[in-house]
A protein has these predicted regions:
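Short, solvent-exposed polar/charged micro-motifs at secondary-structure junctions
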Residues: 48-50, 77-81
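Conserved beta-sheet core of the metallophosphoesterase superfamily
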Residues: 56-58, 62-74, 81-178
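Core catalytic region of metal-dependent phosphoesterases/phosphodiesterases
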Residues: 1-70
Length: 178
């Protein structure tokens, strides 16, 4: 069984690998520090990513150091210290992506008013790109998925397959945002 993008690995294998990778990352980063998962669901793999997140939610729901909100919005907004953090899958038009800083500020005005630095995480294009756009650090994350037909046609086949995680440190060793 393969998912709609015809991944080389079976959907079930992909889900198990993604869950194991996420649990390993949480095991590495969560001892002694709170970690919050930001649920971001894709377009063609929305059911798969939602299922993976629901598993992680159930696994960590009684663990004090791991925060697992049940957001299912297209874009997720958080504040950490003076950081305004946004995450989205990124399956929008290039024009909308260029407007993402403006969209962030409009949709989360309270967070925008209380922060000095902004960062946007998104994926969708399966390759890693980091750039500053309108004063906002934009991190386009690589994908944990095997190449699909689109990737093969566009020569994205050598991109690393990773489950991206990011740590923003605050003032102390137990003060981090993953």
């Amino acid at each position: 069984v393969a998912n709609p993008t015809q991944l080389e690995a079976a959907c079930e294998d992909f889900m198990v690998d993604a869950i194991d990778e996420a649990r390993q990352a949480l095991k590495t980063h969560s001892p002694g520090a709170k970690v919050e998962l930001l649920p971001v669901f894709g377009n063609h793999d929305r059911k798969t990513s939602f299922s993976i997140y629901r598993f992680l939610y159930a696994w960590y729901r009684n663990v004090d150091d791991v925060i697992t909100p049940l957001d299912a919005d297209e874009r997720v907004y958080r504040q950490y210290k003076d950081w305004f953090i946004s995450a989205t899958h990124g399956d929008v038009s290039k024009k909308t992506m260029r407007r993402m800083p403006e969209i962030m500020m409009q949709e989360a005005r309270g967070i925008n008013a209380d922060t000095e630095r902004m960062i946007l995480y998104h994926g969708h294009l399966h390759e890693e790109v980091i750039k500053v756009q309108s004063g906002i650090k934009r991190h386009q994350a690589p994908s944990p998925a095997d190449p699909d037909r689109y990737d093969n046609r566009n020569a994205y086949v050598n991109n690393p397959k990773v489950l991206p995680g990011h740590v923003l440190y605050g003032n102390g060793p137990d003060d981090q945002f993953l």
